[in-house]
Amino acid sequence: MDLVELDYLSALEDLTFNSKPIIHTLTYIAQENEPYAISIVNAIEKHIQKCPPNCKLPALYLLDSISKNLGAPYTYFFGLHLFSTFMSAYTVVEPRLRLKLDQLLATWKQRPPNSSSLEPVFSPIVTAKIENALLKYKSTILRHQSPLLANTSISSFSAPIDANINSYSSFSDPASSYKPSLPSVPFGFQHISGTSPSPGFITLDSLLSDVNRMIVTEQARFIKNPYDNMAKKRFEILLQLKNVLSSSALPYDQLLAIKNQLAQLEKPASPSTSSVATSAPSVPSALSSISSTPFMKPSIPSTIPTIPSAYSASVSSQPPLTHSYVHPGPQSHKYSLSSGPPASLYNANALTPEESSSIDSLFANLQAAGLVPPSAGGKSQGPQASCTEAVSLTADIDLSKSSLATPRPKLSSLLYENYSNQCANCGRRYGNDPESRKELDKHSDWHFRINKRIRESSLHGINRCWFVMEEEWVNSKEEEDLITETAQEIEEQRQKQMESVRSQYVLTPLDPIAASEPCPICQEKFQSVWHEEAEVWVFMNAVEEEGRIFHATCLQEVRPSENKHSNTNTSTQNLAEAAVSSNIKNATGDASKDSQPDVQNLLQGIDIQSILQALGKRKERDDSMDSMSSKVIKQESK
């Protein structure tokens, strides 16, 4: 018994009444753990056998929900022992609950709701077997209740019984109701007589159900033995075939060819003569109790052969079991996904040369029909091979607790080969191609900047005023990994930007009053200097906006870092207007007190000495130009 079966059994203990949320949750768990369908089916069947009679109906409702909503492979595994599971519950529940079980059985003979498949939930062979047993059971009860029905034949209540259907004598005692059943044959291979049935019309749904069943078998085999390359190859081919059947509409002749190839693929090597000889005598002994049941003797017509002979005829004509993981009874040896199988079962899983040749022939026929690309079967070279290997290795991985606990050494080697370079700080992995190495270098530089920032921030505390403003944070872009400039380069760029701001100038106003006005922001007066290139008197580090002169650096500090929002510009202008208006008021107040202007205050911002020197230089240059022009004129006259 594996961990999945134990966990699901513990979850089934809460299903003590007909609760739709609990049934829905358990159905969802079964859907998530579909690779372990055998364990979940084992748990449900054990729960139905051991739970009290009042809890059997909710458990059968859970079985019904899983079968109708999930379908294969659960319907296949449930169908193997559905007869014993259903009848063991039917014989012990109250009479009022048997009507609900009859209604439940009627729904199993119809196709599942919201399903495109026309096939019923369970095989008609299984449901007919249960119906015949129910009719016999009800007729037996009626004979005991009414003496008039004592001599009534059961054949008057039921249709003719199949030769290989077991009688219901084993269910008279509830304690012994779940005994190990006889080896059952998959639904597609069951016979009524020794002759094989004629193949019916092949549909896409039936072919998909066969492929799904074989996928589950090969997946369980591959999980049990990860180093079985042939099982892995079969699993990959079946997955490709399922994708082709699901995505394309194939003609009937191709469906028939695929069906024949699947039938050849399912046929294992015939068992040895000794194994058949040792197992054959056990069949009549196992059926002796069934054939000797008192009330079953008059029910079987004389034209139908006895059960042991019919069974031996069907065994001699039928092919061996194709499903290596046939669900056993509770008293037999358990084969779970976590415990090792017996030696005989392990030998049965080993592929023979006949199976290997059938795999190759199936793959060759699929390639010839154009259903599988030619590169899918061979071993490709280069990156495509690693991608194909990764897809094949991760096909059966499920993000569940039990699946993640399964060791997969091939996946580890695949990770180390494809992502060989690892970051020493955080463990992040990169490939070995040039682009991946560049990404690793950028990632290492990012670690260096972050570590340096952490070391610097640990030396001093963090002040709230250092945080960026809300608008600046909204307009900023996080490009930390893309920054490659050093701190020195950033400082040089900032110095160049400030030099370009300080190099702005405004011509010195001719009006002495306007020239003496200070900056509206810092209230410092401007210094008039001579500009050599423009050859005029200017105010350096100054800009003029709306008739007012500002320091360019002051205006740069007052404005936001990005001149994109008009509201911030308006607030700056309002601040400047307020400063200018206050200065004007002060000036008008002083003028009212003293009507005569103060000459010293007017000439305070003007460098008179520099002006006189510049005028002298200009006069000398003009005189030299006049003298040179006069000499040129005299020479021309001569």
From Swiss-Prot:
Q: Which GO MF term does the entry hold, naming one?
A: RNA polymerase II C-terminal domain binding
| InterPro entries named in the record | CID_dom, ENTH_VHS, PCF11-like, Pcf11_C, Pcf11_CID, Pcf11_Clp1-ID
Lineage, broadest ranks: Eukaryota, Fungi, Dikarya, Ascomycota, Taphrinomycotina
| Species whose genome carries this gene | Schizosaccharomyces pombe (strain 972 / ATCC 24843)
Annotated region described as Disordered, given as residue ranges: 318-338, 615-638
Q: Which PROSITE patterns match?
A: CID
Sorted alphabetically, the Gene Ontology BP terms of this entry are: co-transcriptional mRNA 3'-end processing, cleavage and polyadenylation pathway; termination of RNA polymerase II transcription
Regions crossing the membrane: none
Q: Which Pfam families match?
A: CID, Pcf11_C, Pfc11_Clp1_ID
Example GO CC term: the record gives: mRNA cleavage stimulating factor complex
Question: By what name is this protein known?
Answer: Uncharacterized protein C4G9.04c
So which domain of life are we looking at? Eukaryota
The chain positions of domain CID read: 1-138
